[in-house]
Amino acid sequence: GSLYIISSVFKNNKGGLAPNTLDSELLPPERETFIIGNLIENNNNVDAPATQSTNLSLGNGVVIAGGNNNVIKNNVIANHNLYGVIITATADVNYWPAHGNRVESNLIINSKRADIASSGLSNLGNCFENNYFNTSIPPGLQTLNNCDSSFYPLSADLSGMWSSLARVIQTSDGNYSQGDWRTFEAPANQPNMPIMDELMSFGYD
């Protein structure tokens, strides 16, 4: 809980951001991640290095998989082959629905399957408000699951969850496209964050 991802850029990866719940974690479910003011674009790169679990997020901007009480706000999310933002239940040893997530005031465009989506059984209290987008699964998702309105049980659409489970099966034997990090050119030197320059001036290097 209380993880803040703010004013950052995520692009040309397999997937953008994917807060998720696994039974192997210390205190599941995942909860209270704040994704605010980021640029998340073009995360469809099959050649990016990846583990099996990373491959599951391929082609998505933000995936909340079995997470609770997360906030996705004021982001630009563009050009993804599957979903811009999807809130979905997930299955590990246990079934983990997604509850109480808020998607607000984002620009979400050019997603091939849907810009915003909700999938899975028993998801409650997820809301969508003031987002600019073109497509949603199910249709009418923001209108009927607005943050200031009553909840309508649209989240019973299962297409997103089945898509994820199909990819789990597909990648279970390690047979999926990925790059080798050892062959990538080293990136150019990047500027430090201002706080790091200040710490280094005190000898913390």
Give the location of each predicted region:
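Right-handed parallel beta-helix
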Residues: 2-15, 29-46, 68-79, 99-110, ...
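Acidic, glycine- and Ser/Thr-rich low-complexity intrinsically disordered tracts
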Residues: 111-205
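Short, recurrent motifs enriched in small/polar residues
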Residues: 26-27, 94-95
